[in-house]
Design a protein with these regions (language model features):
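C-terminal catalytic "cap/lid" subdomain
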Residues: 1-130
Length: 130
């Protein structure tokens, strides 16, 4: 689709989680994580790459500290280590990195986390690879 000039954006949030009980759908208390749902969609459709768009050009370790470091390309193992070390905050970059890991581990294909306005700028973004 991208070759035809189409970029598909799905799973934008706002869904209501439900379960089927006695033939009826009932709402339940839950959170639909749009990053993980997007990763699952990308896996299921056989995407060649998975882009997660955010408000920063790359992901960082030591974010907003004197030793802040932008990451260009990291492996699955490095991403897992940075998550375990607490470099990515919940409600912000941590769910995005987990979604990237899910996609890369299931497909072996890269995930790019980048700023929405810089999509297509190959100098931007963090690539997560095997």
């Amino acid at each position: 689709m991208a070759d035809q000039g189409v970029i598909v954006i799905t799973v934008g949030g706002g869904g209501i989680p439900v379960v089927r009980k006695n033939g009826r759908l009932e709402g339940v208390q839950a959170v639909i994580d749009k990053d993980l749902a997007s990763a699952l969609t990308a896996i299921q459709i056989g995407a060649d790459e998975f882009y997660i768009l955010t408000d920063v050009p790359k992901i960082y370790i030591n974010f907003r500290k004197p030793n802040e470091q932008a990451l260009d390309t990291i492996t699955v193992e490095e991403a897992k280590r940075y998550l375990a070390e607490g470099h990515f905050t919940e409600g912000s970059m941590a769910p995005k990195v987990r979604a990237a890991l899910m996609f890369v581990e299931h497909t072996g294909k890269p995930c790019i986390i980048t700023e929405a306005g810089r999509l297509g700028d190959e100098s931007c973004g963090t690539r997560i690879v095997r």
